[in-house]
Amino acid sequence: MKKIITTTLLVGFVALTNSIYAQQATKVQRQAIQTDNIETFKSAFTKAEYDKCIDIKENSYTMLSYSIRHNRKNITTFLLANNSDVNKACKGITPLMVAATYGDTETAKLLLKKGANKNAKDLNGKTAKDYATENKQTATAAIL
């Protein structure tokens, strides 16, 4: 019972911390990501914002996770080249989990090369491999 209460409190604390520190994306920032143009992206975001959790609709993403989610290869490559945190989780979700969900095997490989933790767990105890498996992304699950 004590373990359940401790786990519940920890999950609640992580969720609260993420919601306090997350910021809303501006219209200009959302449009900059959609272009997949590095110069447009750099004009909309400061380097300090690359690893912040930004709320977009009902989800929270780092710019790396968001670019992976929307298949913006130029921005993903740019962020990886500029040392974005490959293990930064927003609401428990890491960039590797996003790549796994959408079956982006090549990006998952790049994330792993950059040091992504394939054993990281979300707030429900799921790993990137679990996400790949649940979404029938067999090729991605195989590398995890």
Regions found by a protein language model. Name each.
Residues 100, 108:
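Short, solvent-exposed interaction modules
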Residues 61-70, 95-98:
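Non-membrane alpha-helical segments in proteins
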Residues 113:
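Non-cytosolic coordination micro-motifs
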Residues 3-7, 12-31, 35-61, 73-74, ...:
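Ankyrin repeat arrays, specifically the small/polar loop and inter-repeat linker segments at the C-terminal end
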